[in-house]
Amino acid sequence: MTNRAIDDSRSLLTLGRVDSVRVQVGYRASPDDQVDRQYLLDLSVPEPDGGGGEDVLDEREILAALEPVLYAGAEARRHYSLHQHRWHTSWGASPGALEIGLLVNTGPRTTAVSEASYDGVARAFRDVMEVVGRPERTPTSRESAVQRTLRAAATAYAVDPDALSLRAEEHHAADNSWTLTLRSTAGDEYDVVVGFVEGYAGAVSVRHAHRIEAADSIGPE
């Protein structure tokens, strides 16, 4: 086979630079169990100084920033599943995206483990924002919060957003965050917090609550 030097500037197929980053972290008791809580972070990558097309984002720095999520209250890191996806389109604004998905196995999902998981993700997401570029904090409207809630639940649990209805909502103005509850036509509930990291709307947590079963109002005979 003949080796050929590759000129990146003339390549027809290229992934280009990374324009956006999505990180998704989920926790479950074991690989055979369902994920009970997911955390999503969506970030835009700032243009490099000088406006060049080079990719200045180091993916290894993002993975290093995510390491705190592996502990979830334990002294040693827990087992995990990691996948990474990169895509790019050649038309329009030619966006390039990097997606990182991480599932962590914690054993029994106790309250202490859940709280430690939350703290680890919040710390890791702050570090990822420093690596990628800290976004400007802007007020999140109710409409934007509802749309992000629907998209987050659909992304995290592969549910049809048209099958979800809003059951409850609460606005935390001081924190620039929203807490909303969705219910599917199948009876599943999703508790969503938009802006759980420093009020940034692109940081969303989704908890899959137990299915609501219809109760017999008469009771057993």
Sequence positions of predicted segments:
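Amphipathic, membrane-active segments
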Residues: 120-178, 189
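C-terminal assembly and membrane-engagement modules of membrane-active proteins
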Residues: 167-221
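Hydrophobic transmembrane signal anchors and adjacent membrane-proximal interface regions, especially
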Residues: 15-27, 89, 100-106, 112, ...
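Membrane-inserting effector segments that mediate pore formation, membrane fusion
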Residues: 73-137
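Ampiphathic alpha-helical segments that act as solvent-exposed interaction surfaces
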Residues: 56-73, 105, 109, 206-218
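Short secondary-structure junctions
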Residues: 70-84, 161-169, 201-207, 211
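Short, ordered beta-strand-loop transition motifs
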Residues: 31-35, 92, 169-176
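Membrane-active, amphipathic/fusogenic segments and juxtamembrane/transmembrane anchors
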Residues: 1-88, 150, 154-158
